[in-house]
């Protein structure tokens, strides 16, 4: 067991650990890939294992590898017992959810939902990363319907009667 809190904490122990991720993370194209990541943090893992994206969490749970890359808001992290390390050197970009709606959609619903844009704006800044983890966990792990989980969230925040 290691006392790891930040990605840079991996540096002294990486040689004892196996890194695993989906095939695409190991391609040479793009800046957010294995090569640039390990170079940026000066990490030298014992081995690197490429897995199908649909099998990554199952492989992590089975202990096929010790370290992987994930979306921090994925509820499967909790199911797999993964500890999300702080990206203390800022290698990965921050991802903040935002609503995008096509102008023609607003036009199409102008009569039946004239306040659609304002209604969506009520959600701005209301969904924290922990909220996302909780909701995706309920849907992906507990098997609840996304509609039910979303309605419960909206109701608990006074956005749905």
What is the predicted role of each segment?
Residues 53, 67-76, 95, 102-103:
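Beta->alpha turn/N-cap motifs
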Residues 12-13, 92-93, 111-113:
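Extracellular/periplasmic catalytic domains that process cell-envelope and extracellular macromolecules
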Residues 80-94, 98:
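Short beta-strand->loop
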Residues 1-57, 130, 144-148:
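Bilobed "Venus flytrap"/periplasmic-binding protein-like clamshell domains
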Residues 26, 30-32, 36, 40-43, ...:
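An extracytoplasmic/periplasmic, membrane-proximal ligand-sensing/linker region
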Residues 1, 24-28, 73-77, 105-107:
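Solvent-exposed loop/turn segments at secondary-structure junctions
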Residues 58-85:
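A ligand-binding cleft/hinge motif common to bilobed small-molecule-binding domains
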Residues 1, 96-112:
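A bilobed periplasmic-binding-protein/Venus flytrap-type ligand-binding module shared by bacterial periplasmic
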